[in-house]
Design a protein with these regions (language model features):
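Phosphate-handling catalytic cores of nucleic-acid transaction enzymes
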Residues: 1-486
């Protein structure tokens, strides 16, 4: 709805579209169709409304075209007669040329939604109709296994906003310029696994998957309290009305020939953008979470930028103002959350996380247990006795570094080679926040998921109360019993 209102400028001036592509992974019975209906029906309604206007314009076009053909035919007859009779034809030829210049042009069709279609048909539709499209499927398998992905380069270029040359054998070739395409594909996990086996490497190598925001919501089938569909609430109605409004504005901008606005960031947001981009670049290094998902990591900051633009366009009536720091931070948190979904379900567990899990298991085996959830260990001992991969210095250092960044491992104050693993994060960092929150960007399954400070404090108080209760309880040794036999 927003993709033709504005583009977004990086702090360095590079401009990108606001178009987004989402891949939603959900099993049968997870109400993919209901989600599609709630959030895409406003687009369908605007499309139907505009296509109703198209019929009237098409009728007017056919009427004017018929009149034009009649007039041109008469001039053509006159030209043939003059030629046959040897009379001068300059005036008639000029009149014929003028008629050709005023030939009625067919109105553009307001098709917005494209389902299972070939890349050529998609490009042709965006060229002949509105250069504004939405590739949609509530069963993404038909798209991935059908004709739409015969040429992922075209869809990649549309996402990037590049000009596209389409060469056709039967019809004239054309160049599609400045078009905008968003996509929303829903697919079942089993179908996605088949697609990954058949085409996964190719779709990642071409950067096709990397352009998508991948969402894998937890399953709800079998856990709902009601079988009926909930009616849209007031918030949903307002959301749908905003979609209609923004889409109509986008179409109106196209029909008036107006240029898209260029959204920029505020100065604080620009500084934050640079910091976030630097953080992501670090994660592309050999010990980073994106090292084995470089396709995704390289596109992540662009998707964050696009989402910040969409949020700004959607939430603000005066959307020509600058994107704020809060909007950019929200877009970052959202993208990083779903980045985990991409890694878990498209890429698989990063090697650094696998090594970190192995290191935790090795520490439990070969370290010295202290208390309920602490292990003291010496780095060289772990290196000597752990699995082969952890015997390499680089692998061990990277895995150990990741655990230290989560706050669960700290170096001993008494020896540089001695460390302590804390399974309870409160015991390790107290009220401080760790650099990396387990379960957010990385998920080390051998350690607890990060909990906010308030929850850690509450759990710590409960543990203290439980210990105090045990200390204050009288010993049952020597208890005279309940009085039986006395």
């Amino acid at each position: 709805a927003c993709q033709n209102l504005a583009d977004v400028a990086y702090p360095n001036g590079h401009v990108v579209p606001c178009s987004l592509m989402t891949l939603i992974i959900a099993g049968s019975g997870e109400r993919k169709t209901a989600v599609d209906r709630w959030f895409c029906d406003p687009i369908r309604e605007v499309e139907r409304e505009k296509m109703g206007e198209d019929k009237q314009q098409q009728w007017q076009y056919q009427k004017h075209l018929g009149i034009w053909k009649t007039k041109r035919s008469e001039i053509d007859k006159k030209l043939r007669k003059e030629t046959r009779d040897g009379e001068p034809t300059e005036v008639t030829e000029s009149a014929l040329s003028e008629m050709d210049e005023i030939k009625p042009t067919p109105p553009k069709n307001h098709q917005i939604i494209y389902n299972n279609t070939t890349p050529e048909a998609l490009a042709s539709g965006l060229y002949q109709n509105l250069p504004l499209g939405y590739l949609l499927s509530d069963e993404g398998g038909t798209v991935f296994e059908g004709r739409a992905l015969q040429d992922t380069t075209l869809i990649n270029d549309l996402w990037s906003g590049s000009d596209i040359r389409v060469n056709r054998k039967s019809n004239d070739s054309f160049i599609l310029s400045d078009a905008r395409l968003s996509a929303s594909l829903m697919i079942q996990p089993e179908v996605l696994n088949q697609v990954l086996k058949k085409k996964g490497d190719k779709l990642r190598e071409t950067g096709f998957f990397a352009r998508f925001l991948v969402v894998y919501p937890p399953p709800h089938a079998g856990y709902r309290e009601s079988l009926s569909y909930n009616k849209p609430g007031e918030d949903t109605k307002q959301f749908q009305q905003r979609i209609r409004d923004r889409l109509k504005r986008s179409i109106d901008k196209l029909e008036k020939g107006e240029q898209r606005d260029i959204l920029e960031f505020t100065k604080p947001a620009k500084r934050l953008w640079e910091d976030l981009n630097f953080m992501i670049q670090i994660e592309l290094r050999p010990d980073g979470v994106f090292y084995h998902a470089k396709d995704h990591g390289e596109k992540l900051m662009e998707n964050i930028t696009r989402i910040a633009g969409v949020i700004h366009l959607f939430e603000n009536d005066d959307y020509r103002s600058n994107i704020t720091e809060a909007e950019l931070r929200y877009a970052y948190e959202l993208c990083r959350h779903y980045s985990r979904h991409y890694i878990d379900h498209i890429v698989g567990e990063p090697r650094i996380v696998t090594l970190a899990n192995e290191l935790v298991r090795a520490i439990r085996l070969y370290g010295t247990k202290r208390g309920d959830c602490e292990y003291e260990f010496i780095k060289t001992t772990i290196k000597r006795r752990a699995i082969r991969d952890l015997r390499e210095n680089e692998n061990l250092d990277n895995a150990l570094g990741l655990l230290m960044r989560t706050g669960h491992v700290q170096q001993s104050r008494y020896s540089n080679s001695q460390y302590i693993l804390y399974e309870d994060l409160f015991e390790a960092v107290g009220n401080r926040e760790p650099e990396i929150k387990n379960g957010y960007f990385y998920h080390i399954k051998e350690l607890p998921i990060y909990e906010p400070k308030e929850k850690r404090d509450e759990k710590h108080r409960e543990q203290i109360e439980a210990r105090n209760l045990r200390k204050s309880s009288p010993s049952r040794e020597g208890d005279s019993g309940s009085g039986f036999g006395q």
